[in-house]
A protein has these predicted regions:
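Acyl-donor (CoA/ACP) binding surface of acyl/acetyltransferases
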Residues: 1-15, 50-153
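Generic macromolecular interface patches on structured domains
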Residues: 19-20, 28, 45, 102, ...
Length: 153
């Protein structure tokens, strides 16, 4: 991922989420600024890995990210809305996980945080052998379903 990907990611992945859950323009601006700073900080961090997926014409398709927490990695997938419901998510996620685990042999568990309403994500993670663990309120104040997959013992 490069710094010039930040606005593309925000526009294609985060803007709809922000508009849905935050109504105040001041809050939206703050979230946008936080988003930009977060990505700038994490691009060069050893505790985060971000993979960008593009189509043949170099259009943004998806992003997967991993936050490394000792022997656990928190995984996220964000798919451009223009590419949803076309069967790409599971293939992208599977490819991303394989690459990540190949490069990070110390990881034993993957953790996914999924909004309860996101049925597609639940199905994809379940298809990849993730198991529901618990419900948890995360950093953004929203409640998420926590799915885990043990990848090494």
């Amino acid at each position: 991922m490069r710094e010039d990907d930040i606005e593309i990611i925000y526009k294609n992945l985060h803007l709809d989420f922000v508009n849905k859950y935050f109504k105040n323009n001041k809050e939206k601006k703050k979230i946008h600024d936080n988003h930009s700073e977060w990505y700038k900080t994490h691009i060069s961090s050893f505790d985060y890995l971000i993979y960008i997926f593009e189509d043949e014409e170099a259009n943004f398709v998806a992003m997967t990210s991993y936050e490394i927490l000792e022997d656990t990695a928190k995984i996220n997938i964000y798919l451009n809305k223009d590419y949803r419901n076309k069967g790409y998510s599971q293939e992208i996620l599977s490819e991303s996980i394989d690459k990540f685990l190949n490069d990070n042999k110390n990881i034993k568990t993957l953790k996914a945080c999924i909004l309860e309403e996101n049925l597609a994500s639940k199905k994809i993670f379940e298809n990849l052998s993730f198991i529901y663990d618990k419900t948890e309120i995360c950093n953004d104040g929203l409640e998420y379903l926590i799915y885990r997959k043990i990848v090494r013992y």
